[in-house]
């Protein structure tokens, strides 16, 4: 009879072998600035004059939840290299969107910033027709004018021995989730924003 390699073990043994496991509640989101075009538009659209200062100081504190993105590979199948053995080869790498959930301050600053950012992206026709006009239409801005390269998420542990830093290249807000409000017991208002980007770079 062949000797089995399966042996019982408990959590203390596993912890000694594997070591401490990563925790979900140690992270920091940083977001320092937008493009000058977006910042200037937001200053007029929202009346917020210190957007860069607000983002650099407050985003990390107000971010309640974040999603670390991943990627997938699109493949093509080849059947002719080896008889009866299909093979797949990668041809494109796709990156999943990432999202941040923020606490909303009583001035609704972040909600106004992200709404204004998306408004800027779609406001290319504003010089042609007023928004209140029945013939108003949307024209998209050039990507270089609204995509930014200052969004990061840092994943670390409480001992700070190891940090993973994700940099998002050419990020912009793709959607804002509906924000529910209701009568009853009060709760903190939160907004969740999903972002698209070209790719991410991981350092760590």
Segments (PLM) and residue ranges:
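Glycine-rich, low-complexity intrinsically disordered segments
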Residues: 1-204
